Amino acid sequence: MDLSEEALAAAAADAEKAFAAAADLDALAVAKTEHLGGKAPLALAQRALGALPKEEKKDAGKRVNVARGRVAEAFEARRAVLLAERDAAVLVAEAIDVTLPARRQQVGARHPITVISERIADVFVAMGWEVAEGPEVETEHFNFDALNFLPDHPARTMQDTFHIAPEGSRQVLRTHTSPVQVRSMLERDLPIYVVCPGRTFRTDELDATHTPVFSQVEGLAVDKGLTMAHLRGTLDAFARALFGPETRTRMRPNYFPFTEPSAEVDVWFPDKKGGAGWVEWGGCGMVNPKVLIASGIDPEVYSGFAFGMGLERTLQFRNGIPDMRDIVEGDVRFTLPFGIQS
């Protein structure tokens, strides 16, 4: 192996030419193997040093190291250039044209049931009432017994109520938010003024006017000397706050096991065609003395009134929604306008 300065310089020059000719990093890697790898001329020269006489080895070693350093420096310089070219090409390929119009961000909206539920809560909180909540999985005691439903009442059957397994657990998915009223009477100090919004469940098929999961809001007032006049005044104020100052209400006799006397409440409401008419809204009445007793309240001292209505039903005639399925199917094209208007 020729270890002369001329031979080593020639090997280094060949390596520099090969590196300079490399058009990309892959080609540079091939050139590196040829000129800096284990079988490269300078690598062979390094191994040949061992065969030299001692007096020649020192000078030859210096020449080899100088040549190898020259080659390594040329490699790193070319590699830096190719890396910069690659990064520049990536920047060009992935460049963002900041002059293009930005994509409009989609704005979300709260669900209309949430909007109207909060609106109703605000109405009653402004009147000094409190918001009460309760569990959606209820016992039959709170859902039926304490509300004066007889043991053979049809509402208790599998055809109307979702019963929780195992059979005989006496647990159900609540069919109304009335259990929250009973819990409020047991847990709160008198007098009581609470509004109870929440989800309820019944074995209805989903169609234009029914859904198996729906929302209700109920109100309960228990105090000394309350009468139907107080109930009527409360419903009038509620209706005007929710539907507008021209809204009127009326009551029609009805029957509910948990109120006595009981009534249906209708509202006189303008329709989308410019007319107006009576629309059934919900149920109401004076709290049945049996319900007060079941809740630990003396009906000789206290009286109470209660009312309840479905939120989906309220939305339907308040906003002119013909099909209840639109409310529950979660289409953002339907819900967005309600969130904006809230």
UniProtKB/Swiss-Prot annotation:
Annotated catalysed reactions: tRNA(Phe) + L-phenylalanine + ATP = L-phenylalanyl-tRNA(Phe) + AMP + diphosphate + H(+)
Coiled coil start-end: none
Upper lineage: Bacteria, Bacillati, Actinomycetota, Actinomycetes, Mycobacteriales
CDD domains attached to this UniProt entry: PheRS_alpha_core
Enzyme Commission number(s) of this protein: 6.1.1.20
Keyword Cytoplasm: yes
GO BP of this protein: phenylalanyl-tRNA aminoacylation
InterPro entries referenced in this protein's UniProt entry, alphabetically: aa-tRNA-synth_II (IPR006195), aa-tRNA-synth_II/BPL/LPL (IPR045864), Phe-tRNA-synth_IIc_asu (IPR004529), Phe-tRNA_ligase_II_N (IPR004188), Phe_tRNA_ligase_alpha1_bac (IPR022911), Phenylalanyl-tRNA_Synthase (IPR002319), tRNA-bd_arm (IPR010978)
Gene this chain is encoded by: pheS
Gene3D superfamilies for the chain: Bira Bifunctional Protein, Domain 2
Name of the featured protein: Phenylalanine--tRNA ligase alpha subunit
Family annotation (PANTHER family): PHENYLALANINE--TRNA LIGASE, MITOCHONDRIAL (PTHR11538:SF41), PHENYLALANYL-TRNA SYNTHETASE (PTHR11538)
Assembly information from the UniProt record: Tetramer of two alpha and two beta subunits.
A GO MF label: tRNA binding
Family affiliation: Belongs to the class-II aminoacyl-tRNA synthetase family. Phe-tRNA synthetase alpha subunit type 1 subfamily.
Cofactor(s) the protein requires to work: Mg(2+)
